[in-house]
Amino acid sequence: MKIALIVVAILVILLAGLVVWMGMPRGPSLEEVAHLREPLIVEMGPQRVLQVRAKGNPNEVGKQAFGLLMKTYFGLKGVPKGGPSFKPPRARWPVQAGIPMEEWEGLYAMPVPETLTEIGVGSAAGGLSVELATWEYGEVAQILHVGRYNAEIPTVEILQGFIRSQGYEIEGLHEEEYLKGPGFLFPGNPDKYLTVIRYRVKKNF
């Protein structure tokens, strides 16, 4: 009897997880964002976000930070849970060379509507906490990276070369926006991850 109850409980948990996963936005197809494969400079307005500050290797602390962000975000009322109004998560790190990844001070964020003014209690875990913030933009240079996160360097170099060739210089942190990546239950195919790499830039007079 106990074994049967345990099996039922496990099935319920798996089913609940599957329902959540099925309801999550899948991200765009490569065809929908193909225009981003070439670097470009655009104007972006400020974005209200849920934000977590976390120091350490993004491959380790990033999972915890995004887990807390998602838990907080999907517990809020009045935020889009899917559709065209849903905006994917993003993160920022310093761009100085020579800083070990363990020393990176990352900002992990989930965009929210400007009308959101408070997030309530229960938005903290494991020494991390969620806060409301506004990310400033202005002129930005960006490019789409297709594939694994650890294979981004050539794409980053293309974007940085483009910035210099257009008479601009980087102003601010390295930013990534995760259009398509690992899901809650399954990692997916890393070779098909879609990531926008972005820098705030200013004209180099």
Located regions from the model:
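A solvent-exposed interaction/effector surface
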Residues: 3-205
